[in-house]
UniProtKB/Swiss-Prot annotation:
It comes from the Bacteria. Binds 1 divalent metal cation per subunit. This is 5'-nucleotidase SurE. The keyword Cytoplasm applies. It catalyses: a ribonucleoside 5'-phosphate + H2O = a ribonucleoside + phosphate. It comes from Vibrio vulnificus (strain YJ016). One of its GO terms (molecular function) is exopolyphosphatase activity.
């Protein structure tokens, strides 16, 4: 009796920088030696979209080339569509988001469309990882690290069903240190809004730059990246402040 051929690995890629962004294209190219790669990503830059879904208009999906789909929607829309419609009869083994054009450290994860795309994969039951390059130069380095993570997962599955957030320093591969497991750091409040006038004299506002690092000590993702190490942070979706439950219960019962 003949052995059944092993099912090839299948990976869904998404991002928040857009379907034609350098990061996702470099990652796809690196992973195609390992797996069938399907890209489902926004038609334009949707950075900062977080976990938003498009609810009041339809999603327009265009196949721009083989196994590459452009979606007029958010990163979360993209993964939701891919897993609940496009690939529902043959789900991917992994959902990877990125490579993001810039860091997703500390509080950034609450706003990040890159992390949100991976989180949607996690919600829908697929092991998911977000990758971000702390810069905009060495995408090949980040793609190589991502491939190594996938290869290690194939050899020995990731020992947690948590969503993983991985940041890679913007350095040549040979200058990178090892990978370290970290916790999220934190930033100060974002800087003030920037007010300007449009050509017609109307006031317009831009969001100010993100705040500087506040909690960036040893063990945080900020510190690890600063030291030239790759940072990997397991994230959980449960936002319950469990240590506060008893105190809140007592407060409510006090007369």
């Amino acid at each position: 009796m003949e052995d059944k051929q092993a099912k090839p690995l299948r990976i869904l890629l998404s991002n928040d920088d857009g379907v034609f962004a350098e990061g996702i294209r470099t990652l796809a190219s690196e992973l195609r030696t390992l797996a069938e790669v399907i890209i489902v990503a926004p038609d334009r830059n949707r950075s900062g979209a977080s976990n938003s879904l498009t609810l009041e208009q339809p999603l327009r999906v265009t196949c721009v080339e083989e196994n590459v789909y452009s979606v007029q929607g958010t990163p979360t829309d993209c993964v939701h569509f891919a897993l609940n419609e496009l690939l529902k009869n043959d789900l991917p083994d992994l959902v990877l988001s990125g490579i993001n054009h810039g860091a997703n450290l500390g509080d950034d994860v609450l706003y990040s469309g890159t992390v949100a795309a991976a989180m949607e994969g996690h919600f829908l039951g697929v092991q998911s990882i977000a990758f971000s390059l702390v810069g905009k130069t060495h995408f090949k380095t980040a793609a190589t690290i991502a491939k190594r993570i996938v290869e290690q997962h194939l050899a020995k599955p990731i020992p947690t069903n948590r969503l993983l957030n991985i940041n890679i320093p913007d350095l040549p591969l040979e200058q990178l240190e090892e990978i370290r497991v970290t916790r999220l750091g934190a930033r100060h409040h974002a800087e003030n809004m920037i007010k300007q006038l449009d050509p017609r004299g109307h006031e317009i506002y831009w969001l100010g730059p993100p705040g500087k690092e506040q909690d960036a000590g040893e063990g945080t993702d900020f510190h690890t990246i600063e030291q030239g190490y790759v940072s990997i942070t397991p994230l959980q979706v449960d936002l319950t402040a469990h240590e506060s439950l008893r105190a809140m219960d007592t407060w409510l019962k006090e007369k």
